[in-house]
């Protein structure tokens, strides 16, 4: 394995530099992920133009890759082995607080960079913190014991697995928050990635009528919405 890792580092608003970091020595309960896919989220675009803090950051929080090196304790706890392809959630909770015990680790203070300057969250944590590799826009990603990983099923490509985050948002917003279910009538305003993900979620949930709205410039996305299961699409500019 190489001695250094190349990463794209946000160093200022709208500015990226390629930097080398030392390949970290992982503890027995840690691992290194060789990054295959790192998605670009709408949040990334916003944070790139207006960073919330000045520290250098390796962005990228929608990450899929292969376990390149793993400590024994890590593999035993996670049920993973070197060579396994995994999707990594961007929240790194403490697993001790009330939120973590409820399974809502995204609300854990240990991963909330807005209130905790020492928080760990992929794509948001300063590259100055130990192990440095806290974002997917790099060759490798560091996985501590409390990283949330999901094995990618055999036959699913890294590119396809990279859609897990937006699709998960669609499932949560449509099914959990809005309560969409069998025979529901649904209006989705906007055929962006999140809106299209909700089309998939609503269709699978058994919605009887799915309507998606957009503008003339969304013509291709509205067409895709139909392919994904929308019953009607409406161009609101016509």
Predicted feature locations:
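Nucleotide donor/acceptor-binding cores
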Residues: 5, 84, 183-184, 208
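Short Gly/Pro-enriched turn/cap motifs at secondary-structure boundaries
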Residues: 11, 22-23, 54-60, 128-133, ...
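Residue-level recognition of beta-strand termini and adjacent short loop/turns
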Residues: 12-14, 27
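Glycine-rich beta-strand-centered segment in the early N-terminal region that forms part
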Residues: 24-38, 51-101, 105-106, 153-155
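NAD(P)H dinucleotide-binding glycine-rich loop of Rossmann-like/cofactor-binding domains
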Residues: 96-189
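Hydrophobic/small residue at the entry helix of a nucleotide-binding pocket
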Residues: 169, 194, 217
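Adenosine-nucleotide cofactor-binding segment
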Residues: 188-191, 203-238
């Amino acid at each position: 394995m190489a001695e250094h890792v190349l990463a794209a580092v946000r160093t200022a608003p709208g500015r990226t530099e390629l930097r080398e970091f030392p390949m970290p020595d992982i503890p027995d309960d840690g691992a290194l992920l060789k990054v295959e896919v790192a998605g670009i989220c709408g949040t990334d675009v916003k944070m790139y133009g207006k960073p919330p803090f000045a520290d250098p950051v390796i962005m990228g929080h929608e990450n899929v890759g292969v376990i390149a090196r793993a400590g024994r304790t890590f593999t035993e706890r996670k049920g993973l082995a070197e060579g396994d392809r995994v999707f990594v959630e961007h929240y790194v909770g403490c697993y001790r607080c009330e939120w973590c015990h409820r399974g809502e680790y995204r609300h854990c203070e240990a991963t909330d960079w807005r209130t905790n300057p020492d928080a760990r969250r992929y794509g948001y944590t300063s590259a100055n913190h130990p192990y440095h590799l806290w974002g997917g826009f790099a060759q490798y990603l560091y996985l501590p014991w409390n990283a949330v990983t999901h094995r990618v099923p055999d036959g699913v490509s890294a590119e396809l697995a990279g859609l897990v985050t937006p699709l998960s948002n669609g499932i949560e917003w449509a099914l959990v928050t809005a309560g969409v279910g069998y025979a529901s009538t649904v209006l989705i305003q906007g055929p962006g990635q999140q809106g299209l993900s909700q089309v998939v979620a609503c269709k699978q949930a058994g919605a009887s009528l799915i309507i998606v709205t957009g503008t003339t410039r969304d013509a291709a996305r509205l067409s895709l919405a139909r392919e994904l299961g929308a019953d009607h699409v409406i161009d609101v500019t016509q």
